[in-house]
């Protein structure tokens, strides 16, 4: 051995070639060992990986390598989420075909991922734009259609005027398209929908089973599904005020207890009664048209200014036939939630209060907080939505004053269920969900074609299974926005599979979130040409044991995947309903920003930073021009605060980048990119190499074990090794990689101390200590292998092992070594903790008392007062009473 510096540039490619040549990460589906499936969300092939990818895939790789070392048959695949608008945008901007652009990017990014040393089974690789993949997606669409899980219907949709496509509600962020940033409009189109709402209750209740998911993700899904219990309430209408003598309007409410506070009824702009009234009211028609210029997403509607139009129609209050409420058309009422109509109780709903304050309708509080005087309780600008007792809620029909909200709801429900309007009860109990069906139609080329043919005679006809896949044509033009498939001269013209007559293909393609809603199941057997899955294999390998990705996908991707898995189960493609047993959401990689004098951003590579006392000053490298150091933000191309992984790997090596990503902060929090932190990680790589290099010549052969029970130094080393092994396993099992890293820093220091204190002439002069050191250094290399695999391979070879550390099994923890002969007890004085005392585990009470009273903290707390008694709870706590 030599003490030369570790050369990552030479070492890392060499070990990567060995892994590839031996296909050691290829998973065998018939392996009898217990399986473990770890998966990071697969990337969109945008062109290059970024530091967020490095962090995400490093975390997954640590889990995969650790579980493999523990004896599991690990599935750790990789593929590409390859359809989507960016490819079409690139085609328009650069005159390149989306397919060429996509596959070129895949080649680049695959090489980058390989340079990270990830333990991926590349034999299972696919891109969602491969016809061999989307063939099966088309097959499942047809199966879902036959099972009643797909529907084609007219619908108001979110239209992105820049991307010229439809967006799901979840893809509208603050009123703008999630990719283009354009203000979204409403349009009425015929669309294909997956009937996710059919599973609303199941998707909600099953969240309780997902105990290895973050609470915040489950809460987000619960809120999005939005279960609410209430009343379907029928308001009679004054027929003298309705356009065609309509007699009633139905309202869904979760707060029937507040009916005495009602001030108006509001209709969605798309409500049939609103449409009928608009026929004879041009001003109302214009208002409705204005409402349609905003998107259909709930979040956008909630934040928009509340606007309404008094239709002149009057509704009759169900508690009093002489009490009439004005009927408005309002921009905040959604047609596809409930009935498309609401009653407004402004005192107890902020949206309604904003509305009545704008239109001068007034408000009447009907719930009073406990402890407030009902006679003086008023609401002005802030609605009261808390608990309390009913007030102002008595008449000859019903008396609610003094009731709790729950009791009042029940009383109203029973009273209105017992009376009729026409031949039906005025009210009936109903459960509603916020979740709406998933519109999957997209008016673009680069997506999975929907396998449908439209025939004037036969109607909607699925493409025969034998004719799948319906492939995208290559000869398309991107000379203007819109869907090139609509303009293609031949592709869409086909014969009807049923009657043979002239027909046309469906030119909409599927939302790209469909592609990512089942890829994890396809990874289990991507070689099956006849079916999306091989049941025996997918049911054995799924669900994914550990899924890793960003919290931004909590609703979009994760909820869609849960639905899609249920749909696959219903059509016989899988035998389970939940795709991900464990879910982990990692934090982002962030970096400070740098703004030049002209207001534009500079990249970190263009900046020099120097310390000036307590301040840091930044300037441009080329001109020396001062630069403002801005806030720390998510790495993004627009802020130019990105760091190229290739530069870091080229300068320091992949292991340094991996170690930094794992060590700097808890994995669920953002990590601040720091050049100093990277340099520190690089120093640790060299530190480990120096330790191994120095110790290797002094070690006995691999496998040497000698009894260390009567050798204090050797026994202490074995205790440290197995304690660290236990701590690292616990850290990785909890995905607390930063704590595992911290334990390794401590352990390396302990091994360095052993080397420094070795007998003169080295460890070889003490065979028992040398044997313990052999075991300890083996464990060190095994423990760093999931995190710094290239360095670990180099060290494994250096200490005399013939195989690859990536194929080595971790040793079993000797639990007897983890039992300490001492115990640390908290010490209280008069019930308040003052310190701790460490005593022998078998110490008797007099020994414990003496040790406690000798503590300076106890003496200070007693302040000369006599000790009345000492209470010792064995193995738990000591309390001194003074």
UniProtKB/Swiss-Prot annotation:
GO terms for biological process: leucyl-tRNA aminoacylation. It comes from Rhodopseudomonas palustris (strain BisB18). It comes from the Bacteria. The keyword ATP-binding applies. This is Leucine--tRNA ligase. Belongs to the class-I aminoacyl-tRNA synthetase family. It catalyses: tRNA(Leu) + L-leucine + ATP = L-leucyl-tRNA(Leu) + AMP + diphosphate. The keyword Membrane does not apply. It is found in: Cytoplasm. Its EC number is 6.1.1.4. Pfam families: Anticodon_1 (PF08264), tRNA-synt_1 (PF00133), tRNA-synt_1_2 (PF13603), tRNA-synt_1g (PF09334). ATP binds at residue 637. A motif ('KMSKS' region) lies at residues 634-638. One of its GO terms (molecular function) is leucine-tRNA ligase activity. A motif ('HIGH' region) lies at residues 43-53. HAMAP family: Leu_tRNA_synth_B.
């Amino acid at each position: 051995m030599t003490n030369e510096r570790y050369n990552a540039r030479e070492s890392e490619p060499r070990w990567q070639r060995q892994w590839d040549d031996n296909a050691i990460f290829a998973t065998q589906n018939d392996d009898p060992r217990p399986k473990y499936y770890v998966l990071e969300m697969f990337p969109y092939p945008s062109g290059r990986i970024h530091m967020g990818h490095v962090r995400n895939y490093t975390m997954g790789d640590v889990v995969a390598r650790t579980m493999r070392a523990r004896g599991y048959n690990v599935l750790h695949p990789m593929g590409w989420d390859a359809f989507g608008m960016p490819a079409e945008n690139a085609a328009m901007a650069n005159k390149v075909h989306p397919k060429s652009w996509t596959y070129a990017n895949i080649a680049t990014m695959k090489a980058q991922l390989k340079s990270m040393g990830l333990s991926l089974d590349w034999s299972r690789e696919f891109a969602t734009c491969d016809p061999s993949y989307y063939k099966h997606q088309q097959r499942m669409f047809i199966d879902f259609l036959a099972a009643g899980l797909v529907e084609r219907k007219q619908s108001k949709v979110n239209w992105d005027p820049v991307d010229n496509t439809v967006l799901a509600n979840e893809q509208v962020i603050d009123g703008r398209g999630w990719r283009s940033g354009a203000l979204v409009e409403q349009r009425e189109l015929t669309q294909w929908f997956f009937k996710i709402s059919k599973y609303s209750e199941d998707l909600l209740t099953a969240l309780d089973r997902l105990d290895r998911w973050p609470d915040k993700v489950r809460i987000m899904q619960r809120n999005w599904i939005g279960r609410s219990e209430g009343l379907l309430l029928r308001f009679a209408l004054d027929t003298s005020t309705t356009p065609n003598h309509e007699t009633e309007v139905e309202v869904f409410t979760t707060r029937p207890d507040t009916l005495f506070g009602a001030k108006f009824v509001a209709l969605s702009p798309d409500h049939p009664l609103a449409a009928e009234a608009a026929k004879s009211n041009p001003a109302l028609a214009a208002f409705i048209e204005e409402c349609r210029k905003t998107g259909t997403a709930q979040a956008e509607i909630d934040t928009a200014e509340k606007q309404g139009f008094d239709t002149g129609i009057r509704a009759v209050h169900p508690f009093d036939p002489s009490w009439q409420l004005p009927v408005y058309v309002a921009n905040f009422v959604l047609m596809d939630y409930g009935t498309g109509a609401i009653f407004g109780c402004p005192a107890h709903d902020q949206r309604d209060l904003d509305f009545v304050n704008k239109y001068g309708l007034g408000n009447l509080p009907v719930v009073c907080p406990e402890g407030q005087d009902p006679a003086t309780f008023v609401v002005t600008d802030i609605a009261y939505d808390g608990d309390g007792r009913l007030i102002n809620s008595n008449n000859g029909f019903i008396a609610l004053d003094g009731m709790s909200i729950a009791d009042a709801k029940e009383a109203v429900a029973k009273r209105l269920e017992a009376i009729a309007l026409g031949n039906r009860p005025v009210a009936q109990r109903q459960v509603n969900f916020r979740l709406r069906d998933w519109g999957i139609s997209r008016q673009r080329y680069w997506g999975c074609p929907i396998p449908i043919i439209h025939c004037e005679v036969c109607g909607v006809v699925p493409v025969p299974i034998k004719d799948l896949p319906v492939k995208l044509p290559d000869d398309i033009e991107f000379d203007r926005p819109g869907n090139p498939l609509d303009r293609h001269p031949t592709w869409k013209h086909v014969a009807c599979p049923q009657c043979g007559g002239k027909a046309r293909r469906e030119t909409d393609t599927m939302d790209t979130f469909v592609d990512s809603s089942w890829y994890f199941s396809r990874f289990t057997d991507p070689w099956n040409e006849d079916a999306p899955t091989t049941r025996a294999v997918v049911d054995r390998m799924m669900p994914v044991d550990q899924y890793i990705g960003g919290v931004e996908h909590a609703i979009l991707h994760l909820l869609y995947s849960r639905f899609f898995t249920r749909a696959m189960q219903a059509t016989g493609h899988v035998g389970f309903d939940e795709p991900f047993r464990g879910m982990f959401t990692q934090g982002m990689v962030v970096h400070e920003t740098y703004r030049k004098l002209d207001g534009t951003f500079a990249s970190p590579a263009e900046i020099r930073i120097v310390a000036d006392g307590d301040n840091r000053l930044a300037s441009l490298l080329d001109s020396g021009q001062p630069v403002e150091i801005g806030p720390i933000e998510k790495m993004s191309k627009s802020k130019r605060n990105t760091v190229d992984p290739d530069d870091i790997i080229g300068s320091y090596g992949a292991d340094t980048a991996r170690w930094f990503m794992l060590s700097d902060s808890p994995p669920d929090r953002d990590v601040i990119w720091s050049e100093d932190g990277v340099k520190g990680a690089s120093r640790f790589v060299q530190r480990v190499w120096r330790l191994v290099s120095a110790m290797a010549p002094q070690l006995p052969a691999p496998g040497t074990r000698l009894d260390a029970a009567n050798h204090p130094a050797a026994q202490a080393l074995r205790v440290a090794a197995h304690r660290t092994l236990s701590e690292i396993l616990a850290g990785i099992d909890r995905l607390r990689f930063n704590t595992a890293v911290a334990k390794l820093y401590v352990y390396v220091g302990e091994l360095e101390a052993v080397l420094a204190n070795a007998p003169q002439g080295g460890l070889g002069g003490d065979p028992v200590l040398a044997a313990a050191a052999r075991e300890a250094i083996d464990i060190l290399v095994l423990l760093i292998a999931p995190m710094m695999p290239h360095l670990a391979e180099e060290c494994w070879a250096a200490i005399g092992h013939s195989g690859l550390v990536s194929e080595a099994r971790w040793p079993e923890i000797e639990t007897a070594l983890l039992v300490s002969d001492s115990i640390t007890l908290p010490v209280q004085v008069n019930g308040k903790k003052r310190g701790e005392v460490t005593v022998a585990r078998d110490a008797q009470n007099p020994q414990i008392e003496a040790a406690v009273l000798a503590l300076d903290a106890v003496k200070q707390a007693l302040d000369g007062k006599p000790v009345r008694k000492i209470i010792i709870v064995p193995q738990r706590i000591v309390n001194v009473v003074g």
